[in-house]
Amino acid sequence: MELPATSGLNAQPGNAEGTTASTRPATALSVAERYLEALPLPAEARAALRREAGIEPADKDAVALAKLHRALARLDAAQTASIEGSVPAYASIGSRLDAAYGTPHAGTATPEPAPPLEHDTAGRIHLDTGPEPARRSMVPWPWVLGPIWRARRAIGRLFSGGTAPVPYEQPDSPDPKGIWRFVGARRRLTLLALMIAQTVAATWAMSSVLPYHGHDWLEAIIIALFALLFCWVSAGFWTAITGFLLLAFHGDRFVISRRAAPNAPIPDDARTAIVMPICNEDVQRVFAGLRATYESLQRTGHLEHFDFFVLSDSGDPDIRTAEADAWLHVCRALDGFGRVFYRWRRHRVKRKSGNIDDFCRRWGGRYRYMIVLDADSVMSGDCLTRLVQLMEGAPSAGIIQTAPLAAGRDTLYARIQQFATRVYGPLFTAGLHYWQLGESHYWGHNAIIRLEPFIKHCALAPIPGKGSLSGEIMSHDFVEAALMRRAGWAVWIAYDLDGSYEEMPPNLLDELGRDRRWCHGNLMNFRLFGSPGFHPVHRAVFVTGVMAYLSAPLWFLFLLLSTALLAKHTLIAPEYFTQPRQLFPIWPEWHPEKAAALFSATATVLFLPKILSVLVLWAKGPRRFGGAVHLALSMVIEAVFSVLAAPVRMLFHTRFVTAAFLGWKVHWKSPPRDDAQTHWGDAVRRHGLHTLLGLGWAALVYWLNPSFLWWLSPVVGALIVSILLSVFSSRVTLGRGMRRWRLFMIPEEVRPPRELRAMRKHLRQAPPTPDFRLAVVDPVTNALMCAIGTARFPHDPKLLEVRDATVLQALAAGPDKLTSKQKLVLLSDPLALSALHLAVWSSDVHRAAWLPANALASKAAA
């Protein structure tokens, strides 16, 4: 682990310039000297502190260090009886921070601002990481699920005198219906008619392919599954066709981006909070993206309307320390004190939605809007200001969701997914907007939210009941959109708005890990399908959320039953009389030409949207995607890859759905934010059974009927090569090689936006982050962690005993044996943390146990 630049732990003990190492035995003076060397002070300041401290050679280490901290804090005799005097390391917090950040570094043209330290009414030193609270009440309404609960509520209304709805069902938007709502209803009826007509035609064709045309019970089940799956695919097909027509010929007159002019002024009272909820994320990546977004917004000239909040739920003490240090460095680099804030939540309640709720309760009264970013989000200043302008121009809009563009990854898998979302995504988002209008999706990030109705209507109560599909809502975004629309506020997708970016999972296994959480969350959300007041569109969103994962076991069952039907016709004599009192036999019929036609039609439904997307890009200029030929070739390779990956996803999603219904727990971990590659051992463990299943399935079908294996080869073949597919698609070298060949190119790679270039630059130049050990040992990091905390009840004798016991326990256990909970307790208590800091420095044994390895190496070299 590297030390931060402000740390002096690697300095050689000696004179002020660090030229001559001291070889004398450890004394009180030498310990104090080492501590002074760990502070980034000029030689004159160190010499003055030595004189002021008045350390005697006979002083014990603890006494010498206490004198040094009192000298740092400029304590007089009257102050030594105060809390600062009894914990001298706590009293010196301000001086230590001033030593690191208060004096301009040599050679800097513009000195970075010092952290604004203050004393509260109790005289405690504090570095404010958040603005003054403007608290709001945010109370969730309990869910009413099922006919029994709804009947009880209706009876309660009857006896209470009237049938007036409860307050949360009353729309309070200035325009709860709007003309677009009736247009949207007609459009969705058209979509439903197209889906039904196409599904009926395909189902009839499927029945004509089967030997008994659906009269056999096994065939009837297969036809029913086919109809359900084809209807699901048909919805996406018509959405893409509609998006193609919009992008190729004309836009939608109801598009939300037409609600305000690009130069519309932003009122002074239209304050917006840009919030980034994080939990155990890559700290350097988080703050690099935040800084790039801040700088882009600053260039627009509208920075005064926005504040930034990093809302941390991190439970790792090392990451917690790194976050605070990164926040301080970003604030100094941007002069962002008072505009960039950091809040760490002690109790992680309701995961991400609870994190947002906590912000709304603390500071919701200060802002009109809130823009939610993910940990990997980057947004341009133009996009941010445009969102506020659109909110001002559409007073009935509750949420406006952008369509984030994926960029920034180098693995082959991620680059294929980036290409797919960049090329095909615009068709689907434009089509989705056409069908849904102001009753659309919210994806949880890169969106702007009107805070007043969000606070009033979108608090999430736990889902009642027992089991894994009850309790705290995991996938909160769809539910919040449904609640917002239930209150009469519109939810829009600004699909034509540029400047919104995110990152993709680097490999197949990481994407599937994310899918498991989403699967569980969508299955939970479906329990809210019958909750009163929801708009039919959002009930349909709950259905599509479930079908995104339930379609996998249905497809798997369809394939298994098709194999069983093959075995039945191969191993069992055909039945000619399948109905009672049947006079004439039913002859089994096989029509390979009809099967081929149905296969071609299904392939058209699946792949035509990809071809149409390429046609649109050809018309608009394919150079941004590597050229016309490379674009077409990339589309073909991506289509082949999607065919190979689909059966693998099918088996994983089948397992996820089964696990959710069986009550298996899901651990919500932050996804990787770097180009993580899949190792062979991980691939064999996760895909080994898939390979065996593919081999066994292929052997069985070949034994039953070799000609049928050709029809099943896309499935069993993909399972057989799943290990190779997972490993090689995660390779960074292959991804970069494809870029050299101009394959899977996207505009963000051909000509990267300024925001993404800035993010990568800040990530490369990010200083090393400290960990929990340095929060205890390093004078500067310790001062920072103490300054951002609050010394609660400093004079309570019982708490003083608890603090003393906590410090003694930490000294006895050492950093490696302390639990994360114990470390977080220390980080949350400035008095205990500063006392531990002093105790560790007062003992050679404890200092050796707590110092990082490279600092020990430097010390040994001295």
Swiss-Prot record:
Biased composition (Polar residues): 7-25
Annotated pathway: Glycan metabolism; osmoregulated periplasmic glucan (OPG) biosynthesis
Coiled-coil spans in chain: none
PANTHER family: CELLULOSE SYNTHASE CATALYTIC SUBUNIT A [UDP-FORMING], GLUCANS BIOSYNTHESIS GLUCOSYLTRANSFERASE H
Superkingdom, natural source: Bacteria
GO biological process: glucan biosynthetic process
Keywords: Cell inner membrane, Cell membrane, Glycosyltransferase, Membrane, Transferase, Transmembrane, Transmembrane helix
HAMAP family referenced in this protein's UniProt entry, alphabetically: MdoH_OpgH (MF_01072)
Localization in the cell: Cell inner membrane
UniProt cross-references to Pfam families, sorted A to Z: Glycos_transf_2
Annotated GO CC locations: plasma membrane
Stretch list, region Disordered: 1-25
InterPro entries: Glucans_biosynth_gluTrFase_H (IPR023725), Glyco_trans_2-like (IPR001173), Glycosyltr_2/OpgH_subfam (IPR050321), Nucleotide-diphossugar_trans (IPR029044)
Sequence intervals crossing the membrane: 188-210, 545-567, 597-619, 626-648, 708-730
GO molecular function: hexosyltransferase activity
Uppermost EC category: transferase
Family label: Belongs to the glycosyltransferase 2 family. OpgH subfamily.
EC number per UniProt: 2.4.1.-
Role: Involved in the biosynthesis of osmoregulated periplasmic glucans (OPGs).
CDD domains: Glucan_BSP_MdoH
Protein name per UniProt: Glucans biosynthesis glucosyltransferase H
Entry membrane topology: Multi-pass membrane protein
